[in-house]
Amino acid sequence: DRQGLTDVRIEPVPGQLTDHYDPRGKVLRVSSTVAGKPELGSSDPTNQMLGVPASTGLSVAAAAVIAHEVGHALQDRERDPWMSVRQAIVPAVQIGSGIGPWLIIGGLIFNMLGLAWIGLIAFGAAVIFTFVTLPVEIGASGKALAFVGSLGIQGEQQTGARDVLKAAAWTYVAAALTALLTFLYYLMLIAGRRD
């Protein structure tokens, strides 16, 4: 609410590290680890407030996660172009990341290089997705850094939340580099079969 996101609902979601913002439904889903705090929306009958009073005992990491997801909601409200691109390519990525490696392996095992190349192209969609995700995730963390203090986190805890947000952004950089290296590995395997 403090960020002007009155149209965003908050819902608990089972599991751990399952926190995410759904731009299609304008829903901020908070994992059961974090949602166990009744102050995170369940006490609000409209499920529209995200207020984290200092008395909640909310961990620094949980506050950072919430702030990051609110950052995504802010990106959605501002119609961030990278977020729109990411949403548009999700279907291709789901298919490509699921079948791409299998097509590559099958193509190599059965010496069907055309199939392996198709698999590499399909897997390439997942690699592109990781790089499109970078500005989205880094942007959400940047927005979260700007208002993490408004969540009732001050002093050393605020510094800790900032460190968590920066570390989270770096995990996406690592994921993108890992995807690129995996793509290059598959490329070398396929190209090496031509000899």
Task: Give residue spans per PLM region.
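Membrane-helix exit/interface motif
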Residues: 74-82, 103-114
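Polar-ligand-bearing catalytic/cofactor-coordination segments
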Residues: 1-97, 128-195
